[in-house]
Amino acid sequence: MTEQNEINMPTKYEPSNVEAGKYKWWLEKEFFKAEGNSDKKPYSIVIPPPNVTGKLHLGHAWDTTLQDIITRMKRMQGFDTLYLPGMDHAGIATQAKVEAKLKEENISRYDLGREKFVDKTWEWKEEYADFIREQWEKLGLGLDYSRERFTLDAGLSDAVKKVFVTLYNKGLIYRGQYIINWDPEAKTALSDIEVIHKDIEGSFYHLKYPLTDGSGYLEVATTRPETIPGDTAVAVHPKDERYQHLIGKTIMLPILNREIPIVADEYVEREFGSGAVKITPAHDPNDFEVGNRHDLPRIIVMHEDGTMNDNAGKYDGLDRFVARKAIIQDFKDLGLFIKQEPHLHSVGHSERTGAVVEPYLSLQWFVKMEPLAAEALALQKTEDKVNFVPARFEKTYETWMDNIHDWCISRQLWWGHRIPAWYHKETGEIYVGENEPENLDQWEQDEDVLDTWFSSALWPFSTMGWPDTENPDYKHFFPTNTLVTGYDIIFFWVSRMIFQSVEFTGERPFKDTLIHGLVRDSEGRKMSKSLGNGVDPIEVIDKYGADSLRYTLATGSSPGQDLKFSFEKVESTWNFINKIWNASRFVLMNLDGMKYDEIDLSNVTEVSDKWILTRLNETIQAVTSLGEKYEFGEVGRTLYNFIWDDFCDWYIEIAKIPLYGEDEVAKQTTRSVLAYTLNTTMRLLHPFMPFVTEEIWQNLPHEGESITISNWPEVNEQQMDSKASTAMRTLVEVIRAVRNIRAEVNTPLSKSIVLEIKPKDETYKEILEQNISYIERFCNPEKVTIAFDIEPSKTAMTAVVSGAEIFIPLEALIDLDLEIARLEKELEKWNKEVARVQGKLNNERFISKAPENVVAEERLKEKDYLEKKASVLERIETLKEV
């Protein structure tokens, strides 16, 4: 289809008007729908599924913008491109939100029961899924909604069951009592990477544990006195001579008056503290291992909500931290308290609720990680490894996998994938299967659900129809090409996707993983509610437009680095788009109704035309190459420099000469170059700014229905002319140098000057002589001399450029008497400023009373004013010599 619409671009760029209706039109036309069975080479990206918990933040906007840039570029390059959308059920996060909402109505999930609570959560999901889609639309993401997935969809649930049952049958999923991270607020287990460690100023409590025979006591130290009721031994090092005679004897545990043994174990560090350690197997992972070695009982002393239970004796019912104080007070009352020392130590907190995590003995389900990690690491030694961008993150990933622990996958929640395990009501037999057991009424299903990350780990292939390996999408689009994600979830998600994909598909889940950093504020601080520095991307879009936000996010950082966000940067992008808008309007108003098939570059002879086409092709080359390497910051700078400097500031100004002249052939050639260059530039810019480029492209002479499915520009070697580039670069340098000299002596362009140019060699002499019309047009000289034997006057203003020296006699630039008078007036101003600031600095009262920063600021002003005064004096003296 070849067309050129009537010009329909208002004088002012209004993002809301430009963006209105375009996304809906793109969807109606199915431009983003992947073909799936095409002969085209496939390219796929699955969106990292956002949680259905609320608004998307700037991090999501950044993440998805990068993905959209990649997929739009690939679509234009002729790939069968799939950008697959979807959302995550986000077990603990979503359940917490729904419970908080119910709490406002004084209802708990237990009041509703499991089934009704899950129904309520599905309602929440539907509401927030719509909201998330609206945000995707606002951002302009080219998603294939016909393939949208949700982690609790039937198909994905089948994949989850398949994986669980297979791993269980291989002995890689097991159930057992172990110390896990327990969130007493959410009342669920957490995996290690759902625990945030914070340095807390706590205390070391030194206490006496009396020997049962009354012969003395052992000194123990603890940061968690509330666990004392769960102590079942005191351990010493087997080679610690201080305690050799006590090994095998017993302690009378204070307050509870329970006899516990003194055991020898190499876990104890002799040099740390007293060398005697209380052992609480049900509330500490290291103590759990000691307990196993010595067959010690495991006494759980807390309820799941963090209050003490009846094993804690008199402390039953107290909150754990209240119990801590009560126990210490009782030790003091019994004369068994030695001392309390301040102690900075790392304390685990729940990532979701912020509660202090309790090491807790619990019956949970685990994935045996060592064999799975080994397979994933082996992949990285092959050609088919996952390529980390930047490469340094591969080491981060490998170190994590080398030191991985078994993964606790069960969660004490109602919202999520229920564990496919059933227990026989009479025999206690365990059945694990993809389908329910026969005689279901005789079985009870496990109450727990799976960790959210269990289903997310299958995302790249479960969304493609796996376990049906004959599914067309699975065969065509898997493995995916690129994963874009933040470095903060390499452990949570990236590592798990890799090992699950290797285990179940035998392939990597994605060829590349592009890792970005975090969005920070302009001062480099992490955005958070407590600092009040968070930014809603939709508010930014409403004010500046999606294109401004997208370009700012995409070009504001290099791979792996954090992004400092500021509204000034968005405003700067908005100004850039305004520049593009105004330049486009100028081009369109001067095309004289040109059609696409009337664009003719066969008569290009002008150096400026050859130069802009050369620069255009250099830009195509750079943008394509940098884009392949995900260097979008550099892509942005390349496009900015070409559009703002080369096209707008230089070529359009030069184009006005033939456009406003009488030569019709020159006019038509210039129109062709303008239309061709702007059309090509819009296609290069489109992945970054989809809305405004579609608007401009539709008004330009173009081929096709939409810029979204237009062809990606390719380098045309025949349009590249190195001589024209050298010539134009020389001319631009000369013109800039003359403009700078004019600015320095305050001479307007309207005043003619005498211009003398001394070229470096014959090549530059020829360039300058052949293109003297450009110098005459943009420098306004009454006379130009280009020669090797120029002898400049002593007062000539000079400049050196790469191919020549430039001289402008000063007397030809300005009216000397008027300029001296103006400078003397300026000198008077600086004399007053110097006197004022020195008056302050010579005032002892000011120096002694004013804050240091204020005094320092005044000293800086003094330095600045003295420099300006000296500069003006020097110029006056120079002019007087003339």
Curated annotation (Swiss-Prot):
Residues 810-881 form a coiled coil. It is found in: Cytoplasm. A motif ('KMSKS' region) lies at residues 526-530. It comes from the Bacteria. PROSITE patterns: AA_TRNA_LIGASE_I. Monomer. Belongs to the class-I aminoacyl-tRNA synthetase family. ValS type 1 subfamily. It catalyses: tRNA(Val) + L-valine + ATP = L-valyl-tRNA(Val) + AMP + diphosphate. Keywords: Aminoacyl-tRNA synthetase, ATP-binding, Coiled coil, Cytoplasm, Ligase, Nucleotide-binding, Protein biosynthesis. ATP binds at K529. NCBIfam families: PRK05729.1 (NF004349), valS (TIGR00422). The keyword Aminoacyl-tRNA synthetase applies. This is Valine--tRNA ligase. One of its GO terms (molecular function) is aminoacyl-tRNA deacylase activity.
